[in-house]
């Protein structure tokens, strides 16, 4: 499995803590590591550094490099896997560019599973997430598109929801469901 971390967003919904020049992924909200650092460390528990691609933009290049350097990883992410978007165009173009890099430079094929990860989420417990990530990889290898979600504990108009239909057909895992629709 490969991973593409999306770290080019401005994350301004958490204003005044995060702002365009210093967005949410670089904040240390729950300890001594930024959300980006936590994302990288989390994914390194599931795959080698050379399988992680980090998408950002030129405005955040030095924030990204600083965050990665301060992790003191025994095997750092290859510098060539840090991709600067030529222009900020939101999520889909960033993913497309990351996939193109994966195919052109890392030799990815249609059979490879690629996990798209935001850089600004707090995910706990990490061990449980890694377990589900490995299960999701196996399901994706069967031809499914897998999305992660959490059960909301209250209504929130600023986010979309995943409406599930039932336990996923052909998949015997309690935590996986067919998606009926996405509700915005």
Residue ranges: model-predicted function:
Residues 6-9, 29, 156-158:
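Short glycine/serine/threonine-biased micro-segments
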Residues 2-5, 16, 20-23, 28-113, ...:
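Conserved N-terminal catalytic core of the sugar/cofactor nucleotidyltransferase
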Residues 1-2, 170:
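Secondary-structure boundary/capping motif
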Residues 10, 121:
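Active-site metal-binding loops of divalent metal-dependent hydrolases
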Residues 125-184:
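Conserved core of the sugar-phosphate nucleotidyltransferase
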Residues 12-14, 61-63, 155-157:
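Flexible loop/turn segments at secondary-structure boundaries
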Residues 117-119:
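Active-site acidic Asp-centered loop
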């Amino acid at each position: 499995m490969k991973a593409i971390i999306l770290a080019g967003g401005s994350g301004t919904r958490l204003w005044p803590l995060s702002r365009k020049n210093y967005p949410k992924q670089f904040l240390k909200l729950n300890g001594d590591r930024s959300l980006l650092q936590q994302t990288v460390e989390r994914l390194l528990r599931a795959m080698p550094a050379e399988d992680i691609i980090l998408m950002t933009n030129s405005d955040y290049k030095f924030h990204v490099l600083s965050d990665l350097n301060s992790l003191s990883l025994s095997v750092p992410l290859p510098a060539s896997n840090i991709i600067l978007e030529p222009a900020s165009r939101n999520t889909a173009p960033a993913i497309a560019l990351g996939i193109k890099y994966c195919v052109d430079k890392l030799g990815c094929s249609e059979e490879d599973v690629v996990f798209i990860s935001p850089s600004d989420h707090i995910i706990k417990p990490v061990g449980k997430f890694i377990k589900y990530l490995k299960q999701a990889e196996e399901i994706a290898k069967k031809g499914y598109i897998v999305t992660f979600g959490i059960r909301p504990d209250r209504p929130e108009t600023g986010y979309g929801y995943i409406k599930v239909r039932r336990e996923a057909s052909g998949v015997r895992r309690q935590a996986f469901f067919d998606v009926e629709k996405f509700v915005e």
